[in-house]
Design a protein with these regions (language model features):
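Enriched for short, Lys/Arg-rich terminal
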Residues: 73-98
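Histidine-centered metal-chelating micro-motifs
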Residues: 69-70
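Basic, Lys/Arg-enriched alpha-helical interface segments
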Residues: 1-56, 60
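Short acidic-hydrophobic surface loop/beta-edge motif
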Residues: 61-65
């Protein structure tokens, strides 16, 4: 069963910030990383529970893509994956998920 992928505004902002940052230093890397992030997130539509539950907040699931972490919620009732944040793994994550 296919789930709809919904990007929350903060997740869109995160992706735009990643693109802007990487484009300033590594233009080719920026397009590759964004393509990889979008492709992996799209796969959640077919297998939304393929990633682990985030240990600090079990409401979220966490997908690792290169050096980034995608935090999302699965709503089985309306068959939707809500992408909440896309963050660098090196950041202090709990403060970004509040």
């Amino acid at each position: 069963m296919t789930y709809k992928i919904k990007y929350l505004p903060l997740a869109v902002q995160d992706l735009n910030n990643i693109a802007r940052y990487l484009s300033g230093f590594y233009p080719k890397t920026a397009s590759r990383v964004l393509k990889e992030l979008r492709e992996k997130i799209t796969k959640l539509g077919d297998t939304p529970k393929m990633c682990e539950v985030y240990h600090l907040d079990p409401a979220y699931r966490r997908m690792v893509v290169d050096q980034y972490l995608v935090f999302y919620l699965v709503n089985d009732e309306i068959k939707t994956v809500e992408v909440h944040r896309v963050l660098r793994g090196a950041w202090n994550l709990p403060q970004y998920l509040e």
